[in-house]
């Protein structure tokens, strides 16, 4: 387990006075704008920056580690794997997985993650394409993603390249 440096609440005030705060996940001092606030701690910034909190949320939802999801963000350069739209803060990227592997709606086994996609690709284009796949001529960008998803190239999925 990695060493996590927590920010003592009394030290938090010193950071805030300087307009920065310490992210306990990425271990960086960042501008306050990079943090959400925590009402349970009197409005102090959360312990994780917004990007890291998003990674934690995605990792937990898909039964993966923080490092797995962080590696995927880095590997994809914070872009959608299909339509290369860049999301500098990671906001708006969804962790896609093979829904045929995980038939229970809203659940993920964590072993069939494929990549990070923008909402348009994850919620619109890809589900539509998966329904008509094989009935219409192949669309190369989607075929490429389904046949060799970014998570597979990092060894983060049980599915080998070429299976979709």
Where are these regions (language model features)?
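Contiguous alpha-helical segments
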Residues: 2-164
